[in-house]
Structures are given as structure tokens and as C-alpha cells.
Amino acid sequence: MPTSIPEQELMEPGHTACQGCGATLAMRYVLKALGKKTVVSVPASCWAVIPGAMPNRTLDIPMVYTPFAATGASISGLREALDIRGDSDYNVVGFAGDGGTADIGLQSLSGAMERGHNVFYIMYDNEGYMNTGVQRSGSTPYGA
């Protein structure tokens, strides 16, 4: 079955991430796959600064910035609000690293999954808390 990557870019040049940052590539391809009708929620992380400041943001989609532990709760609320508004065709995405998912954010993600919300959750596992000095996370392999 032939597949293709859409040409539309929802992540423009000029972000502030470190060179070679895997999180930026992950976000770029997630947005290509999900399209313009996407709302992304990110916790306190590198993604709080990667898109840049308004009005020069590099992402062409709405983003919600949440406390570290609240990504799961925010995507639950976003999904419910969009459904109530009649915008059920929007994709709702939580996009967090391994620290914000496997450690600090696990309880709110668990709640969102248990309630069965129609959302996407992307954990980009870079095996540490990269924006605060590369401390290990709960998903960092033993001995790494």
C-alpha cells in the first residue's frame, strides 16, 4: 500500500530547539499526520520555548501550555470542550517527554485513558529530563 507524507508544513522554520532535537522532528511529523485541525497540549518542558514567542511562533496550530503533571487532564478538558462546541473533527494531542509522562504526568494520563477520551498522546522518550540537565526519568534504561 503506497503511503506519502503530506507536503503541508504546520511547523515553520525558526524554532529555538537545540540542533538535532528529536522532539522537533517528532512534532513536525505528528502535525503532518494529523493536519491543521489539531490542538496540542504540552507540559512544562522544552516545548514551552521551542515554538518561540508570539507573534512569531513556528507552529501553525493552537497550543495549550499546562503544568507539568496536567497534560492528561488538559487533553481531557480540550476534547470535552471541542465536542460540546460541535468541533468533534479536531484532533486533540498531548505531547510530552518521558519525564512528563512516565513520572510526573502518569496519574492524569491514566485518568484520561480510563475515561475513554478520543485523544492522541505522544511520549517522546529522550530518556531524561533534558531541559533541566539530563536527569534520568522512570523510563530511562538501567545503567544509562
Write out the residue ranges for each language-model feature:
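Cofactor-binding active-site loop characterized by glycine-rich and histidine/acidic residues
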Residues: 1-121, 128-130, 134-143
